[in-house]
Amino acid sequence: MADTDIFSFIDSRIARPNVWPRNQHVSHPDWKTLYVRVTKRPLDGQIRDPVIDLANIEAKRPGRGAFRALVAELRKMYPQACIFVESVQPERFQQGLLRMGFTQRDGEPSFYLLPVRT
């Protein structure tokens, strides 16, 4: 398990954007595996910064709302950030992201939410 919790990692990278690494496996009580990157990314016709990328994720209890809860926490704590979910393979998860309001990136199995506020 990763030693750094997700929120400490994101806070440090948003506060100091030039500090490396910008990506890391992080810890969270609901997740076995959670890889996070804080970066800039072109989304919806603009370069967005910050973007919180989520990849290589595995819930401890799949199907119990861990992802929905994580997104709600991230939106509350980082309303200025986009959330990007990278390389989503299961079609059921893709459909769930769309129901949650995510937009699918053209030609990719990746999805994003724009900031709560810009």
Map each language-model feature to its residues.
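Non-catalytic substrate-recognition and accessory regions of acyl/acetyltransferase enzymes
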Residues: 1-64, 69-118
